[in-house]
Amino acid sequence: MNETEKSTHFGYQTVPTDQKTDKVKHVFESVAAKYDLMNDLMSLGIHRWWKDFAITQCRLRTGQRILDLAGGTGDLAKRISPLVGDEGEVVIADINAAMLNVGRRRLLDQGIFRNIQFIQADAEKLPFPNNFFDRIVIGFGLRNVTNQLAALQSMHRVIKPGGFVVILEFSKPTLAPLKAVYDAYSFQLLPRLGKLVAKDEESYRYLVESIRMHPDQEALLSKMTDAGFEDCDYHNLSGGIVAVHRGYKF
């Protein structure tokens, strides 16, 4: 669907474009407290390996300024923080205050605060100067953005020349047998887990549907190119259930 149209998708529903942001906001307000626990249950803990792999693709160095976009609960930021050191900076930006509050408490409890900032921000209109960050990483957040092209263009604007973006996101399984098992697991088990653990079946049904509506590997690659990124590539993880995309700004 063209992102400039007056309607867009919210999971499998078609909704007015100006309503999607609020609907997604309500989902993440509902799931914030149990979000990381549910990630463990939904992925059988494999999300930790996916995130570790994404961070290795960032090639981080001491002193760099990193944007962890849609970084809410701080699960990527806690991996990034020691790699850039006290001379560096990690900015966690998320549109959802509830997710940021969870992340702030969690990182403080773990003693991770010296090089961390939390900012509530819209990915489509990032409130940072041009050429500001050495790297941008966004984990499992892009599919929830209403206008993904606008968000990618905003990322391109604020990243420094020579820097790059790393996008960790659910994608499309590349093996037919895996797809059948994955569909059954996603649509039958995950909403039930959401109901049991987070007391919210509908929000987790949306999260499953949002994965299916997200562009596949090649379509996202094309969208990154349209936003101005160059030398874009991707790695499939777990048979394409997840992909890590990377694009440079020169």
Swiss-Prot record:
* A Pfam family: Ubie_methyltran
What the record says about family reads: Belongs to the class I-like SAM-binding methyltransferase superfamily. MenG/UbiE family.
Q: Which GO terms describe its molecular function?
A: 2-methoxy-6-polyprenyl-1,4-benzoquinol methyltransferase activity; demethylmenaquinone methyltransferase activity
Q: Which reaction does it catalyse?
A: a 2-demethylmenaquinol + S-adenosyl-L-methionine = a menaquinol + S-adenosyl-L-homocysteine + H(+); a 2-methoxy-6-(all-trans-polyprenyl)benzene-1,4-diol + S-adenosyl-L-methionine = a 5-methoxy-2-methyl-3-(all-trans-polyprenyl)benzene-1,4-diol + S-adenosyl-L-homocysteine + H(+)
Identify the enzyme class: transferase
State the name under which the record lists this protein.
Answer: Ubiquinone/menaquinone biosynthesis C-methyltransferase UbiE
Give a yes or no for keyword Methyltransferase in this entry. yes
CDD domains, per database record: AdoMet_MTases
Q: Which PROSITE patterns does the UniProt record give?
A: SAM_MT_UBIE, UBIE_1, UBIE_2
Report the protein's function. Answer: Methyltransferase required for the conversion of demethylmenaquinol (DMKH2) to menaquinol (MKH2) and the conversion of 2-polyprenyl-6-methoxy-1,4-benzoquinol (DDMQH2) to 2-polyprenyl-3-methyl-6-methoxy-1,4-benzoquinol (DMQH2).
What pathway or pathways are given for this protein in its record? Quinol/quinone metabolism; menaquinone biosynthesis; menaquinol from 1,4-dihydroxy-2-naphthoate: step 2/2; Cofactor biosynthesis; ubiquinone biosynthesis
Q: Which UniProt keywords apply?
A: Menaquinone biosynthesis, Methyltransferase, S-adenosyl-L-methionine, Transferase, Ubiquinone biosynthesis
* Keyword Transferase in record: yes
Give the residues the record marks as binding S-adenosyl-L-methionine. T73, D94, D122, A123
**What are the EC numbers?**
2.1.1.163, 2.1.1.201
- Name the source organism: Coxiella burnetii (strain RSA 493 / Nine Mile phase I)
**UniProt-listed GO biological process terms:** aerobic respiration; menaquinone biosynthetic process; methylation; ubiquinone biosynthetic process
Q: Which domain of life is it from?
A: Bacteria
The family database entries (NCBIfam families) matched by this protein are listed as: MenG_MenH_UbiE, PRK00216.1-1, PRK00216.1-5
